[in-house]
């Protein structure tokens, strides 16, 4: 709601339409009900019915039907097109819902496991720094931990 309210204020002050980019993706649907298209539609309807000129604010959800691997593949293509270094860009991201005070990601929460799984499938190390209760860990530690979790889940 805060993003929508801020976006509507910007739209009204600058006399323009505003799009809110959302990173929700297919892997989120089962875990977070508010990431489903049905929720987004109902939420947007309530917003437009409750605010004048709210139709000036819209959502941009390019990954709604894409998993994290698809997002990474798109990121590779876009970084190449824009002349950006993929590892540099992705080293500045954080998927973890349980980051450490240092800012480093955990590698055991569901969101981190899903991210690491996507990097494993992509065949590249994740450039983000992972950490556990002992301190920062190498990519291989995070990767091997997630591979073990996935193997147990598939068993």
Residue ranges and their predicted role:
Residues 1-155:
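Nucleotide-activated chemistry modules centered on ATP-dependent adenylation/adenylyltransferase
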């Amino acid at each position: 709601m805060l993003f929508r309210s801020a976006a509507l204020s910007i739209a009204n002050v600058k006399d323009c339409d505003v799009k809110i980019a959302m990173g929700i993706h297919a892997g989120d649907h089962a875990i977070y009900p508010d990431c489903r298209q049905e929720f987004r539609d109902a939420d947007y309807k309530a917003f437009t019915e409750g605010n004048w000129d709210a139709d000036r604010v819209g959502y941009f959800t390019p990954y709604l039907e894409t998993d994290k691997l698809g997002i990474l593949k798109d990121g590779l293509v876009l970084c190449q097109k824009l002349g950006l270094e993929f590892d540099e860009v992705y080293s500045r991201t954080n998927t973890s819902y349980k980051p450490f005070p240092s800012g480093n990601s955990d590698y055991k929460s569901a969101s981190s496991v899903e991210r690491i799984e996507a990097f494993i499938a992509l065949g590249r190390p994740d450039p983000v720094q992972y950490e556990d209760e002992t301190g920062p860990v190498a990519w291989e530690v995070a990767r091997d931990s997630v591979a073990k979790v996935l193997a147990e889940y598939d068993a």
